Amino acid sequence: SRGLGDVYKRQDRVDGAIYKISGVDPGKGMNWKQYALALLGTNAVMAFIGYLILRVQSAGLFNPNNIENMEPTLAFNTIISFMTNTNLQHYSGESGLSYLSQMLVIIFMMFVSAASGYAACVAFIRGLAGRTKNDVGNFFADLVRITTRILLPFSIVGGLLLVWQGVPQNFEGNVVVETLEGTFQVIAMGPIAALEIIKHLGTNGGGFLGAN
């Protein structure tokens, strides 16, 4: 649409700061091979970092529930799943991930995978337009603009609406309460609202809780 197309025509101070820090020239075009390599390389690096975080999460911050490290095959399956936006979960978030892992791995990859998919789609459309086969855009610029202009603004507003409606957004440990029947139930805490909003905006599933 025209509104989404305008996202790629403007640059603000936030974008400029990100480009400057990362050393990206947003005006430098890429051919399709360079674009694809940038997309794959960026996601591969992020997946590697995410895998390491999952493997050492017990030693990190924001782990009030004392979650242990994720074992190698499960960590690999998890990070590849969220990198590819398939979001296959063979764990329960409230008992298998620290809050740091939820934020730096799951939530982060939900943003990156959605933005990467959108960027690839835009580059494909540029290629079909046939202006030049040697310039389908700049992947890094597209990734930044999609994130800062579309995903983050909607996520912030939507996340605040979820918090307003009572969805937890904190770093407290899980709470054990006694029900009216006299049994005990664990109430999960954590940055749930932040994850749930990007889940609905940019992915096809993968919730904070095991019940999803």
Spell out what each predicted region is.
Residues 15-35, 133-141:
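Cytosolic juxtamembrane amphipathic/interface segments immediately preceding
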Residues 47-64, 86-95, 123, 159, ...:
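Transmembrane alpha-helix boundary signature
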Residues 61-105, 169-212:
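P-loop potassium selectivity filter motif centered on the GYG triad
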